[in-house]
Amino acid sequence: MTLLLRLFTLGCLLLLAGCATTQPQRDQVNWQQERTRLEQLSHWQLSGKMAIITAQQKGSARVNWQQDGDDYRLNLTSLIGTHILELSRSKGEITLIDNEGNPHQSQDAEALIYQLTGWNIPVAGLPEWIKGLPGQAEFELNPDRSLASVRDGQWQIVYGDYRDQDGYRLPHLLTMTGQGSRLKLQINQWTITR
């Protein structure tokens, strides 16, 4: 009887050890599945607040971003509602409307924002980074398989406060550091439009 009990205990321990060793593989598969789902998410909106800190200035803005496939519209307003800028990409054309209502066009959204505001905002990477995707950059995962951080060229992105939204697990806090700037994006609301 004692031998049978020992064999049963040993079998249970081996079974548990086997489950523990397969966990990282299952996590990796789940990350790949979630990554594929997020890559297919191309129509969404968000609203929140952004703090912008450089050596020369500190600022904050309300953020409204609408993504429609490859096209987007980014509105930044002051905390009291004053228009700062509206940046849009439509059919490959980038237009920025400044705080006086003047339109500016360029092929480089980041350079255009910097020229008019002095802010380095990595617009090219934001549609992916905002959703918790690393693009082609180096990245690290949290234990729960959400994106922890991304290093993309001169930018380091650190993620936090993931929440479930319409079947997706989306970040609500991003801290982006690079090009002499630190941006902190607090997302208050996600809307999945398709």
UniProtKB/Swiss-Prot annotation:
Originating organism: Aeromonas hydrophila subsp. hydrophila (strain ATCC 7966 / DSM 30187 / BCRC 13018 / CCUG 14551 / JCM 1027 / KCTC 2358 / NCIMB 9240 / NCTC 8049)
Protein name: Outer-membrane lipoprotein LolB
Lipidation (N-palmitoyl cysteine): 19
Family matches, as InterPro entries: LolA/LolB/LppX, OM_lipoprot_LolB
Disulfide-bonded cysteines: none
SUPFAM superfamilies documented for this protein: Prokaryotic lipoproteins and lipoprotein localization factors
Superkingdom of source: Bacteria
Gene: lolB
An example Gene Ontology biological process: lipoprotein localization to outer membrane
Organism classification: Bacteria, Pseudomonadati, Pseudomonadota, Gammaproteobacteria, Aeromonadales
Similarity comment text for this entry: Belongs to the LolB family.
Recorded topology in the membrane: Lipid-anchor
First and last residue of the signal peptide: 1-18
Keyword Repeat annotated: no
UniProt-annotated location(s): Cell outer membrane
A cellular component annotation (GO) from this entry: cell outer membrane
The entry's keywords: Cell outer membrane, Chaperone, Lipoprotein, Membrane, Palmitate, Protein transport, Signal, Transport
Lipidation (S-diacylglycerol cysteine): 19
Record note on quaternary structure: Monomer.
Main localization (coarse): membrane
Keyword Chloroplast: no
Gene3D superfamilies, alphabetized: Lipoprotein localisation LolA/LolB/LppX
NCBIfam families, alphabetized: lolB
Job description of the protein: Plays a critical role in the incorporation of lipoproteins in the outer membrane after they are released by the LolA protein.
